[in-house]
A protein has these predicted regions:
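Active-site-proximal or metal-binding-adjacent scaffold patches in catalytic folds
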Residues: 1-64, 73-95
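Walker B catalytic acidic pair
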Residues: 69
């Protein structure tokens, strides 16, 4: 997984992002670029977390989108599933 991350992330961000993936039991799926979204988070029925990310040549876009989706995961775990996707709880977490 680390080797794959080097293709999509700035080199200095790979270790931190890899640690986030391990610590939060994230299944990261990199897909062909979609026009409607850069990334997506959802919790699977088995409790594992799925983050789907567009494959992009822009490593900084990938990084910001990854952090954005991890913030959804953490906000939902801390505050429950009934919060608004980009509400105050998510904004607090994304900081």
């Amino acid at each position: 997984m680390r080797e794959i991350l080097f293709k999509y992330l700035p080199e200095n961000a790979v270790t931190s992002c890899f640690e986030l993936i391990k610590a939060n039991n994230i299944y990261l799926r990199i897909v062909n670029e979609r026009k409607t979204r850069h990334g997506d988070y959802r919790q699977l029925p088995n409790g594992q977390h799925l983050i789907t990310m567009n494959a992009t040549a822009n490593k900084y876009r990938f990084l910001i989108t990854f952090i954005h989706e991890v913030a959804h995961l953490i906000a939902f775990e801390r505050f429950g599933r009934l919060i608004k996707p980009h509400g105050n709880e998510w904004k607090y977490t994304f900081q």
